């Protein structure tokens, strides 16, 4: 197994304040939320080193499509358990210029002082759904092959926007 990771995530999140301030008063179902997040393909770093970074970037057509973008279409609140709030998210994921609908469970973790919240989740996608041919580095003479399925795991920390900023 090899994995790629990025520490650089951009975007915005607008969320109903009641979800963070008084989740016990929120009923299950759709909530008011907007979000868009992106990751620069070039910021993804492989566990296997720079050679695999280049292979991955080429497979993802990084020069033509430099960003991976997720746009939230719907967020449905399921339940709150202490500082953890559980949701189902639906949206569009664009990779290599190809957009697909995705849905996955999301957990929101509130800090005690409510200054920051963390969204985390996991979903699976197939490279071929985004017209990406799973890379097989030529230096390995076909000995290394990558499967089609990819597990996307994310953790996105957001802070409250201060008034006037």
Model regions and ranges:
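Low-complexity, acidic/polar, glycine-enriched regions of mature
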Residues: 1-165
